[in-house]
Swiss-Prot record:
Transmembrane segments: none annotated. It is found in: Host cell membrane; Host Golgi apparatus. The keyword Heme does not apply. The gene is UL135. One of its GO terms (biological process) is symbiont-mediated perturbation of host natural killer cell mediated immune response. Residues 152-163, 219-238 have a biased composition (Pro residues). Interacts with host components of the WAVE2 complex ABI1, NAP1 and WAVE2. Also interacts with host ABI2 and TLN1. Residues 126-145 have a biased composition (Low complexity). GO terms for cellular component: host cell Golgi apparatus; host cell plasma membrane; membrane. Residues 105-274 are annotated as: Disordered. This is Protein UL135. Remodels the host actin cytoskeleton in order to impair immune recognition of infected cells. Mechanistically, interacts with members of the host WAVE2 complex and redirects the complex to the plasma membrane. In turn, the efficiency of immune synapse formation is greatly reduced.
Length: 308
């Protein structure tokens, strides 16, 4: 331990050194205590010759042998190793007809007792007991007292009714007719309808209505007012005027003049005509002039729209 203490001190851990020292002291003290307990167990007086069932707290140890007070663990171990002797169960059952024992309202028909055989005098008169635990004094009881106990049921007991018959309910009392005069009149009987008589059909009258006031006029149904004329929509933007050159171009591409009217007898094939034969191709100067005119007309339309 000294070398351990020096090694821990050299490491420089003062807290760890104190903890190790405390653990070492605790283990040394506990080892001494266990050695004292094992040495004191053999000094119990009469440990092998005393009676079974005794407790460790019943021993009286001399003062010179007592080193430490008897620990509770020793007593518990003593009780565990030497259990108490089992006690013989006492007889608590009741004898029928035995002198000196009271019989308080025995059950009838008996549930706990059995009817004894009176013909044999040696039969015990109680049930639930073995002859080894109880004395045989009950066999000397007289059979006359047994008969008197069995044949005298308690006054509160009544025999059950036979199963075939049922209890009849009590008849209600008959009331005599009253002779007092009453002011209640019986209802008048409705006459029976006669046969072979046709009753004329009755006309149902409508329920009366309330009289109308003098200046009352029927409500006027509301008439719908004429619809207001919808304002006319503004005119749409006028289309740009088509130029002559563009019209000629479209007509040239779509027109197909025939020299004479077609007859149904002739074939449907048309002669091939070239575009150059019908109209000469346009020049670039003409196209530029047409574009300038179109731009000028568009500008005029835009100025007129802004002015309006």
């Amino acid at each position: 331990m000294v070398w351990l203490w020096l090694g821990v001190g050299l490491l420089g851990g003062t807290g760890l050194a104190s903890l190790v020292l405390a653990i070492s002291l605790f283990t040394q003290r506990r080892g001494r205590k266990r050695s004292d307990e094992t040495s004191s167990r053999g000094r119990l007086p009469g440990a092998a010759s005393d009676k079974r069932g005794a407790c460790a707290c019943c021993y009286r140890i001399p003062k010179e042998d007592v080193v430490e007070p008897l620990d509770l663990e020793l007593g518990l171990m003593r009780v565990a190793t030497h259990p108490p002797t089992p006690q013989v169960p006492r007889c608590t059952s009741l004898y029928i007809g035995e002198d000196g024992l009271p019989i308080d309202k025995p059950e009838f028909p008996p549930a706990r007792f059995e009817i004894p055989d009176v013909s044999t005098p040696g039969t015990p008169t109680s049930i639930g007991r073995s002859p080894s635990h109880c004395s045989s004094s009950s066999s000397l009881s007289s059979s006359a007292s047994v008969d008197t106990v069995l044949h005298q049921p308690p006054p509160s007991w009544k025999p059950p009714p036979p199963p075939g018959r049922k209890k009849r309910p009590p008849t209600p009392p008959v009331r005599a007719p009253t002779t007092r005069l009453s002011s209640h009149r019986p209802p008048t009987p409705i006459p029976a309808p006669r046969k072979n008589l046709s009753t004329p059909p009755t006309k149902k009258t409508p329920p009366p209505t309330k009289p109308k006031p003098v200046g009352w006029t029927p409500p006027v149904t509301p008439r719908p007012f004429p619809k207001t004329p919808t304002p006319q929509k503004p005119p749409r933007n006028p289309r740009l005027p088509r130029t002559v050159g563009l019209e000629n171009l479209s007509k040239v591409g779509l027109s197909c003049p025939c020299p004479r009217p077609r007859t149904p007898t002739e074939p449907t094939t048309l002669p091939i005509v070239s575009v150059s034969e019908l109209a000469p191709p346009p020049r670039w100067s003409d196209i530029e002039e047409l574009l300038e005119k179109a731009v000028q007309s568009v500008m005029k339309d835009a100025e007129s729209m802004q002015m309006t």
